[in-house]
């Protein structure tokens, strides 16, 4: 593939593919130890179309990374419309939007952060990072029964945990700059998930909870003898955590009243073989048919849950903006589901609010190009039909019969933005 590059500098798309491939194969302790985002120049046409068409057939490694365009500020209307049209035509939600100037403005708001840096973000785009810097994430699970008092206590505990984690700065195999940045900023990432399972949210409530996090960290940092964190609050996409705790993911609505949830497993993993022989519906992964199996589970949302069919794209964006302004010192990660007749209005909203759009990704409401998508809509009849095909029970004690040797393999979690953070891999833990 790279023979044609002999004697010249690599193109960004070639560097991107190399990094994606490295991310795919580097495994430590049986877990894939990489997460990737590519922030590319506005004029980079190859990166703009990296996930256009049937990209997974020949460039499957690109599923390992999120792709966003790094705007330096609000572009001219014509420039914005060309990029917006490309995003629409890709049907994959990429490239997403990352506004470096908006990120810098957001980082400056609390007055605690040095902003003379070329800020980027983490792969899921909820943490504003300098170069050579880490995330430090903790999560609050919001339940329908939570009130301000219980959420206050959850935020306090998550902040204490994150502050303790910020003291772990012994990075023996990294350059000193990583340690210096980590110790100087002591970043936290106190996140909320299950947001739309509760209707408590107002600007006042969010501001109160943010202040709880800031004051808790300030006191805890003083007790530990470390600097106060320069940025604390965010909203993670929480695709995996939400599955574990049965909540809506991050700031997103639940997918639908009835849907299919897909889960990936490595064919060498004893758990994959056990689930196959237990009768759970499965098929080969279209991107890795020889090594990966996709399992399908019919799901039903809890009664009264907010689903994505109940929120317009503009409502999702306005909700995002409220959390951006009143909860986050970093930013809320979001993938906005856009119906076919909403793209023009959504583009107008994004352009109007561009100075605050630090980072957002978009995905067509239904006909996106990801095969074996993490969520697939079904109706009630289909749900009960598929449920009848599921095994009545599984004797998990028999899993030991399959675990004859160490067959640990790297979990291949796909990238987080544009719906792919919802991909769950059974071998990732």
Model-derived features with residue positions:
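Active-site cavity-forming subdomains of large catalytic enzyme subunits
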Residues: 1-142
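Inter-helical turn/loop segments and adjacent helix faces that build the functional surface
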Residues: 2-13, 144-152, 172-178, 198-206
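Short beta-alpha connecting loops at secondary-structure transitions
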Residues: 3-8, 67, 177-181, 202, ...
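Internal maturation/activation junctions in enzymes
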Residues: 30-75, 169-179, 192-237
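Catalytic alpha/beta core of large soluble enzyme barrels
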Residues: 87-89, 99, 106-174, 184, ...
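Short acidic, low-complexity intrinsically disordered linear motifs used
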Residues: 408-429
């Amino acid at each position: 593939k790279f023979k044609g590059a002999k004697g010249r500098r690599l193109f960004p798309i070639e560097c991107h593919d190399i990094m994606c491939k490295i991310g795919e194969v580097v495994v430590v302790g049986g877990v894939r130890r990489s997460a990737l985002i590519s922030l590319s120049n506005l004029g980079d046409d190859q990166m703009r179309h990296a996930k256009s068409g049937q990209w997974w057939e020949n460039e499957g490694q690109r599923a390992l990374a999120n792709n966003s365009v790094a705007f330096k500020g609000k572009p001219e209307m014509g420039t914005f419309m060309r990029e917006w049209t490309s995003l629409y035509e890709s049907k994959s939600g990429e490239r997403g939007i990352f506004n470096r100037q908006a990120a810098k403005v957001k980082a400056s708001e609390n007055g605690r952060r040095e902003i003379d840096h070329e800020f980027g973000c983490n792969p899921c785009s909820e943490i504003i990072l300098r170069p050579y810097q880490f995330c430090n994430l903790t999560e609050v699970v919001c339940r329908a029964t939570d009130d301000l008092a219980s959420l206050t206590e959850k935020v306090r505990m998550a902040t204490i945990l994150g502050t303790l984690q910020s003291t772990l700065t012994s990075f023996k195999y990294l350059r000193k700059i990583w340690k210096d940045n980590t110790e100087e900023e002591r970043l936290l990432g106190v996140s909320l998930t299950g947001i739309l399972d509760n209707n408590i949210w107002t600007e006042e409530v969010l501001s109160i909870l943010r202040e709880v996090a800031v004051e808790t960290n300030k006191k805890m940092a003083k007790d530990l003898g470390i600097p106060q964190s320069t940025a604390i609050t965010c909203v993670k996409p929480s695709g995996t955590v939400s599955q574990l705790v049965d909540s809506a993911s991050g700031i997103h609505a639940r997918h639908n009243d009835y849907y299919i949830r897909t889960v990936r497993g490595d064919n060498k993993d004893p758990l994959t073989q056990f689930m196959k022989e237990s009768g759970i519906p499965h098929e080969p992964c279209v991107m890795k048919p020889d090594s990966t199996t996709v399992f399908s589970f019919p799901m039903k949302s809890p009664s009264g849950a907010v689903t994505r069919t109940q929120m317009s794209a503009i409502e999702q964006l306005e909700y995002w903006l409220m959390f951006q302004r009143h909860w986050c010192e970093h930013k809320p990660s979001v993938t906005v589901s856009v119906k076919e007749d909403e793209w023009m209005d959504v583009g107008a909203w994004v352009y109007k609010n561009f100075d605050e759009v630090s980072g957002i990704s978009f995905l067509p409401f239904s006909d996106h190009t990801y095969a074996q998508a993490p969520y697939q809509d079904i109706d009630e009849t289909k749900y009960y039909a598929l449920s009848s095909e599921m095994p009545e029970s599984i004797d998990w004690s028999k899993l030991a019969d399959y675990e004859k040797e160490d067959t640990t393999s790297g979990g291949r979690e796909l990238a987080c933005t544009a719906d792919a953070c919802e991909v769950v891999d059974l071998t990732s833990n």
